[in-house]
């Protein structure tokens, strides 16, 4: 076979593979495909340097791993802000319009699958990482290479992250479950679970057989210079990625609503599961000005489909005790299939909600579920009552430790700090992904260790030894070593992660970062006045933090001595023209807006997204637009990029 013949045969193989795996429309028999693939493979083995970068032979599974290793995203994979109705959408647009009143919106289908980040360097697929906690995920590169809708090589040579959703088509999902039923295996609940499970197979042969599909929805780190998000996406599709159906630009809320309702009308006919529509501000400069909250970009939202309603029956109420002692009622209902998954429990929030609904055991009720939202009861059919309904009473004692509870109306609390449920849930929270991220220390393992009297509090995690675990059910050598290594790896974590992991009421990730940056290790000794003086730190937060430290200070001190956390040093900014000044950036400059923003913040400036009388400087480049005009109108001092640089 000559090189020219080989290239032609590879193009034919790629065409056949795409027809089968991507478009579900085979144009060659298995025998024809296998025969040609073997011929090409023989050529590749003899001429490895001449092999085609996207040869289907490079996608074949065969690698079996012991486990997945952790890998970091180059830039964070953010969550999406959810909106559920027209009013919430209007509110989101109103917030975005404060930066730019002339908005265009890039709308695309929201696929219900498993998020994946592809890292290409010099045009080669180097790594594929699951979302994980948004910062660190799992390396599934070998499995990603078996997915035919993921190019192994692209023409873009700069370092770039291309992100999307791994899904399974509904028809393929049905075939997989039929096969699993024949083999006596547990069925997948829905296509999303099947896609996520298939992507995380240790044996890439299994992944290769599942006909996974990759839908691009965005990018992470990149050096592209397009001014519109829609232009970026068109470029990404030109690199060999599939373009989703019904992706378009909208100029106003009416056009967005029209497209959204089209999605709703065809969602059941769509070949893949959808759970909404993603809306993004199209202008890149506006995206940069809007920036991010702690959880999601302000320039993007997910317009979720309406919740699916079903009728079921309330069988019982289970009481759950959280780490702060709050007792939450959970509805146990007759198992009901909703939107592809079986629901047997629903949230009730608190006992005020039970009283508002006038809910009784044995009532027939309406239960709703939408995507990831926890199912909840919205209505009781009073007219269907038969007389065997049982009134639900507010608890007077803790269901776990039997201590007397404090009933504050909306909240009912167990005040016993040694309550087993409080202790277990505090340990679970401490070890969770968004806190200390101790892989292998999930809910069931924590409960097992607590029940076996191996741990009694957070500190005991760090005293665990091999011999403590070797006789426990389900613990083998590898599992024990992995857990002990995961615990050891938390040592040297940032101080704010440790404080956040303590689960102090009203003190979340943002507040933890703020107080740790301000006070360092001395944070545990701070009084009310010191805390309340911080910007955005309210009375409730300060009182909660002080009370927690009063009760648990000894434990926290020991924990800090064991973990020896990293302390971020607050930079002391020397006097300069930008210190404590409010600055607005507009227009195109030689450096990116993000770089300039970072430089100014390092100098002690507050970079704002809008011009007002309180603005000290507006720094402008080419195509400055309305912010430049507003600065002139208000008499705000204007600086060119050169003038700004001269002040550094």
Curated annotation (Swiss-Prot):
GO terms for biological process: DNA repair; DNA replication. Gene3D superfamilies: 5' to 3' exonuclease, C-terminal subdomain (1.10.150.20), BRCT domain (3.40.50.10190), DNA ligase/mRNA capping enzyme (3.30.470.30), Helix hairpin bin (1.10.287.610), Nucleic acid-binding proteins (2.40.50.140). It holds the Pfam family BRCT. Keywords: DNA damage, DNA repair, DNA replication, Ligase, Magnesium, Manganese, Metal-binding, NAD, Zinc. Its cofactor is Mg(2+); Mn(2+). The active site is at 110 (n6-amp-lysine intermediate). NAD(+) binds at residues 30-34, 79-80, 131, 165, 280, 304. SMART domains: BRCT (SM00292), HhH1 (SM00278), LIGANc (SM00532). It comes from the Bacteria. Its EC number is 6.5.1.2. This is DNA ligase. It comes from Aliarcobacter butzleri (strain RM4018) (Arcobacter butzleri). The lineage of its organism: Bacteria, Pseudomonadati, Campylobacterota, Epsilonproteobacteria, Campylobacterales.
